[in-house]
Amino acid sequence: MGLMLLCSMMGPGCLGPEWPEALDPLNGSDGIVCHGMAEYCLRSYDNFTFPETHNSYATIEDDVWMAMNHYTGLQAQWEGGIRAYMLDTHHLTKEDTNVEDVRFCHGDPDSTFLHPCIYSEVDAYAWLRLLGSLMNNSSGDVVSLLLENYVPGEHLEVLFNQTGMLDRVFVHQPGHPWPSIGDMVLNGTDLVVYWDYQYDERYPWLHHAWTHSWDTPYGEQEQSEMSCRVGRGDGVQPVWHLNNWLSSVFGFADPVRAGQVNDYDTLLERALRCWEEVGDRPTFIAVDYWEDGEVTNVTITLNKMSHWSGEVPAHP
């Protein structure tokens, strides 16, 4: 079945302006694959589910031992199928606030406790360069970043420019439909960046997270407290984050119960329930300790489904 026939079945807007007229993603000789499947190139960005790591850089491999969220770093996360990352941008200290001092650190810089970069400093430039290298060697994957930001926008622009990531960012206009994954790949705009800071017209590529998307509450202490309710944002946008991690009584990520909430059957049931309740599939499923449980397998299953009520495919 050719691309044009597929699009006639899927409705207007399927064939974006970036598709060469004769390109058929289902024809192996055309050589375009998106997230491992040619047909996913036809999916719009908001009609796909991406596995996401919370505080992606806060790992033992990155020498973060206090307030860590995962055991393994970016390389392992990428190889495990993670394609969306939550990052916290800070300056190195309250005195070291130049553009070269931008780091990924976990914590509140206004805390009366230690500055977060004292106990969890990760080189943001090196981290993003590695991500860019991984993306360059991938086969049609779109990546998303959600920044909890504590530095000026101009410092982020330098960071993304010097690491080569600014050249590949996609800019979304609020209220406009999201493009297909294939369009984004072919157009070289395979990176979407959100930040939880207010909109700044100087940086249209830094999408205000809670204007362009929304999320569920996060950091509950009990699994029974997890819900599909709106946490931040309006609950109307088709792009949304299903936050799926528990916090300990001290407010840190809970490694003991991560495997419980990331369990395949448990997480799949929650995702399908929220899909039904919300009306849109979760765009992102965000977890702590991604190594425990099967978040990537859950997203593989969800992406094989066109509706929450459909037949659930076999376990990957």
Description of each model-found segment:
Residues W19-P316:
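Catalytic cores of phosphodiester-bond hydrolases, prominently lipid phosphodiesterases
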Residues M1-A22:
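Secretory targeting signatures
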